[in-house]
């Protein structure tokens, strides 16, 4: 198990964009999921700080000793039902997995969604990200038969929803 004695969770800064884009793309490549219709090819992956200036959105970065370990956020994706946001761009470096950091980031995102007045959190994911699926299920996310909203991530074949 890896140990990071002083992990900080903070909001995204402009200088985080390159590191976070690399973490997202490397993770998808690692799991064989660097496919069209995923965030791998989404241009916003290179401009997360700018994306998360949208009202009622938030992105949290996990950092230890000046090194970005990953992050995750919420976003009011177009076309989602009223009162619903999306859990987005939740990715961690390999050495930052299995230490509870993903759980901490999800908790922070869900808390922020509640504070922003959302009643539901939606997410899209892939079969290949099987470790994440287990965590989402533990948080009470339930599978949906079809996607919600207009994410344009046609490569994501699993959709989940959690009521807050």
Positions of PLM-derived features:
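Generic detector of contiguous secondary-structure segments
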Residues: 9-17, 118-127
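Glycine-centered loop/turn positions within well-structured domains
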Residues: 18, 99, 158
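Acetyl-CoA-dependent GNAT
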Residues: 3-7, 11-95, 106-108, 112, ...
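C-terminal "cap" of GNAT-fold acetyltransferases
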Residues: 3, 23-26, 119-122, 126-164
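Conserved glycine-rich acetyl-CoA-binding loop
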Residues: 67, 80-81, 93-107, 114-116, ...
């Amino acid at each position: 198990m890896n140990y990071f004695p002083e992990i900080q969770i903070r909001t995204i800064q402009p200088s985080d964009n390159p590191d976070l884009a690399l973490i997202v793309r490397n993770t998808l490549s690692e799991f064989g999921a660097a496919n069209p219709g995923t965030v791998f090819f989404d241009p916003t992956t290179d401009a997360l700080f700018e994306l998360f200036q949208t009202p009622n959105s938030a992105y949290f970065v996990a950092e230890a000793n000046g090194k970005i370990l990953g992050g995750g956020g919420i976003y009011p994706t177009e076309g989602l039902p009223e009162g619903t946001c999306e859990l987005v761009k939740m990715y961690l470096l390999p050495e930052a997995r299995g230490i509870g950091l993903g759980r901490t980031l999800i908790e922070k995102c869900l808390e922020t969604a509640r504070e922003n007045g959302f009643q539901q959190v939606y997410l899209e994911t892939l079969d290949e990200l099987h470790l994440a699926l287990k965590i989402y299920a533990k948080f009470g996310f339930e599978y949906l038969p079809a996607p919600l909203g207009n994410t344009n991530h046609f490569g994501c074949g699993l959709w989940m929803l959690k009521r807050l």
